[in-house]
């Protein structure tokens, strides 16, 4: 082979499947995380996000109060029948349950997969349109991922956001974020962590559902292309996308069957069947709407080769934190509220949710420009 041909070959994308000693474990973990009737609890709120939630119940934002808040749900008896995995914040990985075990150790003993948010938050993307953001955290990533694996975590999550402005997002943010998500995914798999890839087309804006569908399809297809280029092990990877809905400031409301059709149709156009599961974010939907939409998707008469389940934060926790109120006397009421929401979403994952069995109120949990 001539040197010229050799040089040209080195410039071609490899498209080779990643070689990792953890492949079998990754696939088994992803399968466990997408078990029928189960989903994920996102308990990875930052210190700043906890401050906002605690302000609503008059609770000071201390490390111990944050531990009690996480323990409210993680130590809830029987929650493992509805929750397959929990996304933890870095602080929580080191904190201890009532048994004296670290939370990852405690969760694993109960048959729940512990995970970790590994991104380092949003930063301005200078190449993009005004207000567009990238996600920091790839520097020193392998060292951090190995540390979390050693502490018992078996999956991770990384969030990139896309804000629709004037009916679109810039090509700069689409390509930059896709590359970031793909690099994060393969580095995670090299270290034994199942990557949850979260390309969130945000609910902020005045756009209609058709615009959300068009932008989501473009964003997800670029992410999939980047994952292919980097050789991700699809069977050991999960996707955490937005649902395809109208903008929160549009005055439009998508009914459950419409949201289900648009979302499943968009996924089917771009997501490989080899991916074991799609774990939706709730993105500011009310607790009830998040359950209704998921249930409709699991009853949608369109091809669905992946498990469709939940990876909710506010849509699982909001009622619980209000009933808890930061008081020991409110723990049982808070846990009942949490278990109710976990059960409703478990039923929605199975396509057996009934609105009549749920709470009467359905208040939006939308927060403009929400960060975690």
From Swiss-Prot:
The record marks 372 as: Necessary for preference for fructose 1,6-bisphosphate over fructose 1-phosphate. The active site is at 198 (proton acceptor), 240 (schiff-base intermediate with dihydroxyacetone-p). InterPro entries: Aldolase_I_AS (IPR029768), Aldolase_TIM (IPR013785), FBA_I (IPR000741). One of its GO terms (cellular component) is glycosome. GO terms for biological process: glycolytic process. Its EC number is 4.1.2.13. One of its GO terms (molecular function) is fructose-bisphosphate aldolase activity. The keyword Lyase applies. Substrate binds at residues 66, 157. The keyword Protein biosynthesis does not apply. Keywords: Glycolysis, Glycosome, Lyase, Peroxisome, Schiff base. It catalyses: beta-D-fructose 1,6-bisphosphate = D-glyceraldehyde 3-phosphate + dihydroxyacetone phosphate. Pathway: Carbohydrate degradation; glycolysis; D-glyceraldehyde 3-phosphate and glycerone phosphate from D-glucose: step 4/4. It is found in: Glycosome. Belongs to the class I fructose-bisphosphate aldolase family. This is Fructose-bisphosphate aldolase, glycosomal.
